[in-house]
Amino acid sequence: MVPTTLLKVLKENTFLDDVATFYNNAGFQLYLVGGAVRDGILDIPTKDFDFTTDATADESLMLFKNNGYQTTEIGKAFGTIEALYENFSLHVTTFREDSYKDTSRKPEISSSNNLENDLKRRDFTINAIAYDLLENKLIDPYSGLKDLSQGVITTPVSADISFSDDPLRMLRACRFVSSHGFSPDSDTFEAIKKNIDRIEIVSNERIRDELNKLLIGDNPSLGIRAFVESGLSLKIMPELDKLKIEVDPKHHHKDVYEHTLIVVDRVSPNIVSRLAALLHDIGKPNTKGIDNGKVHFRHHEVVGARISEQILKRLKYSKKEIQDICLLVENHLRPHTFKMGWSCLLYTSPSPRD
């Protein structure tokens, strides 16, 4: 049975049925897949719709052009075309199967005439559900609906194979923890820990983009915990792990890391604010001192700004983003930051702020 939330998506976006109809009239199969199905079921709005089809990219381009749609050929080499309708973006990809070399996450693509094989190549079961719009039927060969209802992140094939093939999927799993509040099952999480070295073949730009999506999610602290506890942070942002330091030797409190997670959750969900929150105490491990049994972190904001700059340059952030984030990190203890909407960074924790 198709959830009413997904039916609502079709009712609100009647052009989707039109697209399915002109593909069907031309003798082609067409299925809605990926995030549109997942988020439609969860009643999360979207303006991006992904389809899979047995039509070639050229055939899809012709169909959309003949029906008055604007199109782009970005991704055509991978069997994907884009069509535009008002403020909506439609991506249509020919059924395919992917294979990978050990040294690259870029797949070698071969066409397929089999929907199930196309779904099998996808990152997680929650994204491997197809919807036949005209038949009003869900195709779910990998139990994605069950995982979606239980909030579980797992893979259509062996997680070990999936993450070795495309290591960025490991960070994407952490992103879904943040954006949707889901959790990897034990096998999936163990596979991430086992394959963290594979993340080194992924470009810093792709890592940055996925990290951004994690940070602007509704549950960023949960995503960061998964990022750290899986070991991925050691390969991408090892400075983060160093925040687990004692600030009260007598009671062995380790609250710099926990304080950081609280702050990240409290600030506005834009990437500059969230990154500044994540990095605002990054200088504390390098400035920790003890006088008369009391811990201090003198000038940690200045040191933190320098460390932040190194991290952000490594991850290929823009000069403007680096400047804005480092300015917030360096000034997060000053009163005028309240005027910048930055009071959350002055959250009072048991640790000294000096």
How would you name each of these model-derived features?
Residues M1-R353:
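Catalytic cores of the polymerase beta-like nucleotidyltransferase superfamily
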